Regions:
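A short acidic, often aromatic-flanked loop/helix-cap motif at beta-alpha or helix-coil junctions
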Residues: 55-59, 108-109, 210-212
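Conserved alpha/beta core of the MobA/IspD/sugar-nucleotide pyrophosphorylase nucleotidyltransferase superfamily
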Residues: 136-139, 143-237
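Short alpha-helical oligomerization interface
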Residues: 1-6
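A structural signal for short hydrophobic beta-strand segments in well-ordered beta-sheet cores
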Residues: 7, 125-127, 203
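The conserved acidic donor/metal-binding loop of glycosyltransferases
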Residues: 80-82
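Conserved core of the sugar-phosphate nucleotidyltransferase
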Residues: 44-45, 86-167, 171
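Conserved N-terminal catalytic core of the sugar/cofactor nucleotidyltransferase
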Residues: 9, 13-77, 181
Length: 237
């Protein structure tokens, strides 16, 4: 790959350009990118840019906290290799919870289109009746353990930001999170540690209308093109 993953183009438009268009449609302009591989290429987007110099040996959570000083007040955190519809973003913005996590209730058809085995690459997600998340990001043994799929999009209130900073700083002291090396931790590890601490992590359920590019095959998938066209149409209307 000769560019950061978020700059990969599908139908002539990069993932990050598509994501920025959706954010701008909801008047969200204060955007911070956190780059690793070939991060200097991200300067052209004109947003604030933070760089994880250790990107090759660290994971998502470490990368997020390379921008720790930017985590203040209400914050939306999004992976760079996804695109979501304006409607999904609107649902997230409506949530009044301190920690709100978008989950796809219709995940199974998307996973089946992308892989022979829908348990491949899927993670556990267990909900309380009121939509509060009890478990996230573990390896599922059965489909029953997956009540939705995390898409990599979430929102934190000022209080929620303080909660995750506390979890991260505590983890820095031991260099571990959930028994794993902190630098290799995933975002879902942070969310699970937050749940374990007794803080509420609330789901924002959606159905479809988002895409993720994990593999080259995702770019060739007809469903990817169909969803991106639909997302673009709703932006243009």
């Amino acid at each position: 790959l000769d560019c950061p993953k978020c700059m990969v183009e599908i139908d002539g438009i990069s993932l990050i350009d598509r994501q920025i268009s959706v954010l701008h449609a909801e008047s969200l302009y204060d955007i911070v990118m956190i780059g690793g591989y070939k991060a200097q290429m991200l300067k052209k987007f004109g947003t604030k840019l933070k760089i994880n110099p250790d990107y090759s040996k660290t994971n998502m959570l470490w990368t997020l906290f390379c921008a720790e000083e930017e985590l203040e007040g209400d914050v939306i955190v999004s992976y760079g290799d996804i695109v979501y519809s304006r409607e999904i973003l609107q649902e997230l913005l409506k949530s009044t919870a301190d920690i709100s996590v978008v989950i796809d209730k219709g995940w199974k058809s998307y996973w089946q289109a992308r892989s022979e085995d829908p348990l491949d690459d899927a993670e556990t997600l267990k909900l309380r009746a009121d939509g509060v998340i009890m478990e996230i990001g573990q390896l599922p043994k059965t489909l029953e353990e997956i009540e939705g799929q995390y898409i990599g999009l979430m929102k934190f209130s000022a209080k929620g930001v303080r909660q995750i900073k506390q979890i991260f700083r505590d983890a820095v002291k031991t260099s571990e999170l959930l028994g794993k090396p902190l630098e290799n931790s995933y975002m879902t590890d942070l969310l699970q540690a937050t749940i374990n601490k007794g803080f509420l992590v609330t789901s924002v359920p959606i159905c479809g209308e988002w895409i993720e590019v994990d593999e080259v095959s995702d770019m060739d998938l007809q469903l990817t093109h169909d969803r991106l066209n639909s997302i673009q149409r709703s932006l243009d209307s």
